[in-house]
Design a protein with these regions (language model features):
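N-terminal Rossmann-like dinucleotide-binding module
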Residues: 1-49
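General small-molecule cofactor/ligand-binding pocket signal
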Residues: 32, 52-54, 118
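Short, Asp-centered acidic motifs that coordinate Mg2+ and/or phosphate
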Residues: 33, 66-67, 116
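Beta-loop-alpha module in the N-terminal Rossmann-like domain of NAD(P)-dependent dehydrogenases
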Residues: 49-110
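Short strand-turn motif at the edge of the Rossmann-like AdoMet-binding core
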Residues: 95-96, 121-123
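Rossmann-fold dehydrogenase core element
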Residues: 105-122
């Protein structure tokens, strides 16, 4: 079985759950990169978790991942998800997918165009 290659957008506690899942199941998942907004955060995460981190969106896209995990602040998750859908990348986003009906309808329009987004919920 081929591994699923993915990138992670975000570096908070929810994003780090996906790092732990990938490390627990290396025969199934491979993290190509974690996108961080600052180099300081990227260096910190890379050192703590021994994964590749970057501040370059272009680098993340160049990996041609099977999907992108979007685990950012809830007020940004819809817009960030749409940015990655616009790049042609399937999105696995954390909840909430959107904060209002208009934003949810925008996400639905991506589905109608054949773009894929899956929403996940995790509990501590």
């Amino acid at each position: 079985m081929a591994k699923y290659h993915f990138i992670i957008i975000g570096s908070g506690w929810r994003a780090l759950y996906y790092v732990r899942v990938a490390k627990a199941l290396p025969e199934i998942f491979c993290i190509d990169a974690m996108y961080c907004r600052t180099q300081e955060k990227a260096d910190l995460i890379a050192g703590q978790y021994q994964i590749h981190t970057t501040t370059s969106i272009e680098e993340c896209v160049a990996y041609k991942p099977d999907f992108a995990v979007v685990a950012v602040k809830k007020d940004a998750i819809c817009d960030v998800s749409m940015e990655w859908l616009d790049r042609g990348i399937t999105v696995l986003s954390e909840t909430p997918a959107a904060l209002d009906t208009d934003s949810l309808n925008k996400l639905y329009s991506y589905y109608k165009c054949g773009k894929k987004q899956v929403v996940a919920e995790q509990y501590r």
